Regions:
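ATP-dependent adenylation/nucleotidyltransferase module used to activate substrates
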Residues: 1-142
Length: 142
């Protein structure tokens, strides 16, 4: 069975979609403007959730729309494995990072995705149970 996509190109997608009340084309253009503003590398946090996926999509489209000669700085996508998620979620995130690296390489986009894991003595469970840290809440984070 052949896959059917709603949009034939990323340009068509940017023209048609609205995100948080703004045209996707505008958000991609704003990300592109910020990318070209200086030479400092970017580090993007990625959890695999809807918010970080949307941000990553906007940045990827901005880099894709940037002429190759202007893709002058690196973008690092970092996904931190908290060792709390289920194997299914961890594998989905790892798969997304692998696909992202492959596509960025194919399209000559200066973006690399990385999966990081804490040392065992710095894991969520070691901090919570071993060191006695209080559990994170909406108003308290480690």
């Amino acid at each position: 069975m052949d896959e059917a996509f709603r949009f034939a190109t990323s340009e068509e997608q940017c023209e048609a979609l609205v995100v948080a009340g703004r045209a996707l084309k505008y958000l991609v253009g704003e990300a592109q403007r910020l990318y070209l503003e200086d030479s400092r590398p970017w580090v993007i946090g990625y959890s695999g959730g809807k918010d970080s996926t949307a941000i990553l999509q906007i940045i990827f489209l901005a880099l894709l729309a940037t002429p190759k000669e202007n893709r002058h700085k690196s973008v690092y996508v970092v996904s931190s494995d908290t060792l709390v998620e289920t194997p299914l979620v961890v594998n989905l995130v790892k798969g997304a990072l692998l696909e992202l690296n492959e596509k960025a390489l194919d399209l000559d986009i200066p973006l690399t995705a990385h999966h990081v894991v804490p040392k065992s003595n710095d894991s969520f469970w070691a901090n919570l149970l071993g060191k006695g840290y209080p559990a994170p809440t909406q108003t308290f984070r480690w």
